[in-house]
């Protein structure tokens, strides 16, 4: 009898449990994802190069993150997508000057509760000593599935991270643009190589699905949307991966400094959100992920994204107080006087002829290296160094990036080919005196400034030779090299020592490969000298030794015919800068 009663009770209990389970309510989990990318050292709302207040910054992002965490709590995930270690002197100071303190980029992201980071090409450019130290100091994993250790054949960094919130399992796969060998010397990434993004993503997607069985998969790619093939390598393959590798719900991208928020269909017909917050923490990617769960399983999910403007948020006083010592250290560093300059110089003149700004770079490169010819471009579209004291901050205007100085062997014919391609990207082929001298994006909207069709950091001129640029001629026929700067003959068949930065020397901008016609694999064999430190370091040393700089245009090149180019330069200067050419 007791046995029957026990069985009856058990059956009733099981029935109740089954009824309850069958009527279990669905549960919605909301997760907020905030992506920063290409912050480029813009940690404080102050430009330490131009010495003025600035937009964006992690100080504003902190205010936004705090606001979102009040709403979503631990379900608010801050993710960084790389290129955080180069740009402003704040990063440079903790990269190379104060190497004993915790790197400010690590300390700030730790403070803000970042859950995962990614490697960017400008992080790699700082070199192993810097990025290895920074990675160790981050309280979160820095990803890089396609950064491969030559010794093991395995990823040098953690390939993916698993994040769990309220029973929802999220996988984040990190990758970097594989085009780094096209820009950076091997010493900066020694012992490593970079796998193409699409095959890497395909392989890791299978591993993640099989091993982790996540509910949501996020791609964290330091690569732009699409295009730009460098040799056999695609620089920006994020869209290809989003469309061609089924499984991603969200793809967070960066690198190309271009805002984007769009949904694309993958090969299975499912939507994938692709979002890019551009650079300098002026906006962040703001993604809302809603997961509906029942019986411990995901039955529905939705993804919505937008770009949130950080300039609508106040600077976080809490953040600024916490990092006040670091702010002061950087401010003291950039305020140090290293010399004086006799006149104001600007890159604005560099597009229209020989200019004091670029010719100062040429002179320094030739003096430091002992080369016969120098190549250099305006690395900032509109940089200026004012007459008077030169401080460390001015050096970041004079030379924007941490490039090394190379000396390479080039033939006279290769020098001409290099310049032909450079000027074809920069100068229009004029058919009439009324045409533009510069190669602009057309049409130019009425009342708006003109923009170059191509990147101005690829507009190299030369020093050490006298030459003309005939803008009535097509590419391949524009450049006439008259002589060496000292008047001696220039020989198309002779090999010359050419000073240029490491970005260009490794094939950046394609001027050495497509222009000069040197095979990519041969470039490293042409390098006969490379500095140990970045070019800015040697420029600072040079100025401290000289004490007074008296820059002037060397007038070793000019646009012709003069009767066309001089009036056209005045018109185009006004279109570019909204002011008259002096």
Where do the PLM segments sit?
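A composition-driven signal for long, intrinsically disordered, charge-rich low-complexity tracts
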Residues: 4, 13, 173, 504-505
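Small/flexible residues
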Residues: 4-6, 167, 384
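Acidic, metal/ion-coordinating pockets
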Residues: 21-312, 352-364, 374, 530-531
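Catalytic centers of hydrolytic enzymes
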Residues: 26-32, 36, 41-51, 55-67, ...
């Amino acid at each position: 009898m007791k046995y029957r009663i026990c069985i009856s009770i058990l059956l009733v209990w099981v029935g109740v449990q089954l009824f309850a389970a069958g009527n279990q309510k669905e549960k919605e989990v909301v997760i907020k994802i905030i992506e920063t990318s290409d912050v480029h050292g813009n940690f404080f709302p102050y430009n330490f190069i131009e010495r003025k207040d600035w937009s964006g910054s992690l100080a504003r992002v902190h205010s936004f993150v705090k606001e979102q965490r009040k709403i979503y709590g631990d379900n608010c995930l801050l993710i960084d997508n790389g290129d955080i270690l180069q740009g402003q002197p704040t990063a440079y100071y903790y990269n190379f000057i104060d190497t004993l303190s915790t790197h400010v980029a690590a300390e700030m992201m730790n403070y803000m509760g970042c859950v995962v980071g990614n490697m960017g090409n400008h992080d790699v450019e700082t070199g192993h000593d810097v990025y290895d130290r920074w990675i160790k100091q981050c309280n979160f994993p820095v990803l890089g599935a396609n950064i491969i250790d030559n010794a093991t054949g395995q990823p040098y960094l953690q390939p993916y991270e698993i994040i769990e919130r309220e029973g929802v399992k999220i996988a984040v796969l990190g990758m970097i643009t594989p085009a780094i060998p096209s820009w950076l010397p091997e010493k900066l990434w020694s012992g490593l190589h970079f796998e193409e993004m699409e095959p890497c993503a395909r392989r890791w997607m299978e591993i993640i699905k099989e091993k982790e069985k996540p509910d949501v998969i996020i791609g964290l790619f330091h690569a732009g949307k699409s295009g730009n093939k460098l040799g056999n390598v695609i620089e920006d393959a994020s869209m290809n991966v989003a469309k061609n590798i089924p499984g991603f719900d969200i793809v967070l991208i960066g690198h190309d400094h271009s805002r984007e928020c769009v949904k694309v269909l993958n090969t299975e017909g499912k939507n994938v959100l692709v979002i890019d917050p551009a650079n300098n923490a002026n906006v962040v990617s703001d993604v809302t992920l809603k997961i509906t769960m029942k019986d411990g399983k995901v039955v529905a999910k939705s993804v919505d994204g937008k770009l949130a403007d950080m300039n609508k948020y106040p600077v976080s006083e809490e953040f600024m107080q916490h990092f006040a010592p670091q702010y002061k250290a950087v401010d003291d560093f950039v305020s140090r006087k290293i010399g004086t300059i006799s006149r104001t110089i600007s890159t604005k003149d560099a597009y229209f002829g020989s200019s004091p700004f670029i010719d100062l770079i040429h002179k320094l490169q030739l003096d430091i290296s002992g080369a016969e010819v120098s190549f250099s471009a305006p690395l900032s579209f509109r940089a200026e160094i004012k007459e008077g004291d030169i401080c460390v901050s001015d050096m970041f205007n004079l030379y924007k990036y941490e490039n090394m100085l190379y000396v390479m062997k080039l033939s006279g014919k290769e020098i001409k080919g290099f310049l032909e391609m450079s000027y074809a990207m920069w100068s229009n082929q004029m058919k009439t005196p009324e045409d533009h001298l510069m190669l602009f994006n057309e049409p130019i909207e009425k009342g708006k400034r003109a923009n170059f069709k191509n990147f101005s950091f690829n507009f190299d001129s030369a020093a050490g030779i006298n030459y003309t640029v005939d803008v009535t001629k097509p590419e391949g026929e524009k450049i006439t090299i008259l002589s060496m700067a000292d008047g001696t003959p220039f020989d198309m068949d002779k090999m010359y020592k050419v000073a240029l930065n490491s970005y260009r020397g490794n094939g950046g901008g394609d001027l050495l490969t497509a222009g000069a016609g040197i095979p990519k694999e041969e470039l490293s064999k042409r390098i006969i000298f490379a500095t140990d430190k970045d070019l800015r370091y040697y420029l600072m040393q040079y100025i401290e030794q000289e004490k007074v700089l008296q820059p002037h245009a060397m007038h070793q090149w000019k646009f012709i015919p003069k009767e066309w180019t001089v009036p056209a330069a005045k018109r185009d200067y006004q279109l570019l800068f909204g002011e008259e050419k002096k």
